[in-house]
Amino acid sequence: MYKAKRTAAQKVRRCLGKYELGRAIGQGTFAKVRFAKNMETGDHVAIKILDKAKVQKHRLVEQIRREICTMKLIQHPNVVHLHEVMGSKTRIFIVLEYVMGGELHDIIATSGRLKEDEARKYFQQLINAVDYCHSRGVYHRDLKLENLLLDTAGNIKVSDFGLSAISEQVKADGLLHTTCGTPNYVAPEVIEDKGYDGALADLWSCGVILFVLLAGYLPFEDENIVSLYNKISGAQFTCPSWFSAEAKRLIARILDPNPATRITTSQVLQDQWFKKGYESPVFDDKYYPYFHDVYDAFGDSEEKHVKEAMEEQPTLMNAFELISLNKGLNLDNFFESDKKYKRETRFTSQCPPKEIINRIEEAANLLGFNIQKRNYRMRMENIKEGRKGHLNIATEVFQVAPSLHVVELKKAKGDTLEFQKFYQTLSTQLKDVVWELEDAAEDMS
């Protein structure tokens, strides 16, 4: 018989509480992001994983904790949703909404500028999300195309609040003082580092984004960082000829280098160009977040830590191994033609692999067999000695498809006829587990 286990790849499932972790989809200085699935609901999520030691070494505990608390304050259809926060002894896990449509930046990079109506739709969603955040005292401070994701319906989802600042942390002069953000999108007052209004700085970045959507390129670019900052501080940009007069007027009011005279978000919402086709999102914003899970995640209490586990999955059969199970194509059968009974057999099942292996164990125990089990492999030995010693049977569950498994039973020691009788009794007891047995004719050579 072809030995499936020699070539089949063993799958190992990495579990984090109720989540199954998948491939890495992002990597930063302090965090890795993995695709994951909620095993209870089947929903896909993204889990940001932070190393506690690295965070503590760089004295970023408070900043990361603030980021998490900030995201919990935000419940808006155009902002990436934070589901929950968990912790282990060594890591922090931030469970986020998984946004499947990619980055808005990629659309511009591959297709160039957008039509005005399409750009306006994205800008409307962005402004609505930003206005919502500001109303709750939350400022993004790093708005750029790369942080604007798209869902499957083509709607914006603002991501990455790693540089956000809560209004409670504003200094006595009522201004923020930390310089951050991406150079091409940053407001002049942020560059000057004299303190700035977070809402007005965010709006400047929104103006840069609108320009890029309509033009296909940045309004402020220069290889020399000093020259770039000079262009930003002086608002040295020119709108292309294809911009409508209304769009030019709005962009000029947003990209005003003087924050005291710059248009506000509430004024943008009343702008005639902006209001064209505008539909305010309807959603329930009566949300009162709790923060105890954030402190539990950063704490040292093992009782409140999430369980991490590596779980072996059934071996996955490839196409050649499946073909070898077909008696007509299996060359091993030529060498077994003189044997009355086969020393191995199998059946298929649509039950979960854990249920299959547990049911076999229960039935074998009732038939007087001792069991040794490891994941989806099992060795069964009859307590009573038979005609040729103790009957010993090796069993393994293989995965053929997500909901289809092959269960293989092989006689390792003992009498072949006793093995066949055992299998007939076992398959009868497992009739609700067995989907299809090998053809009865294949039980005889």
From Swiss-Prot:
Report any one BP term from Gene Ontology.
Answer: signal transduction
Q: What positions does the domain Protein kinase occupy?
A: 19-274
- Pfam families (UniProt xref): NAF, Pkinase
Question: Could you tell me the keywords of this UniProt record?
Answer: ATP-binding, Kinase, Manganese, Nucleotide-binding, Serine/threonine-protein kinase, Transferase
Q: Give GO terms: molecular function aspect only.
A: ATP binding; protein serine kinase activity; protein serine/threonine kinase activity
User: What segment(s) does the record annotate as region PPI?
Assistant: 342-371
Question: Where is ATP bound in this sequence?
Answer: I25, G26, Q27, G28, T29, F30, A31, K32, V33, K48
- Protein name, please? CBL-interacting protein kinase 3
Q: Which organism is it from?
A: Oryza sativa subsp. japonica
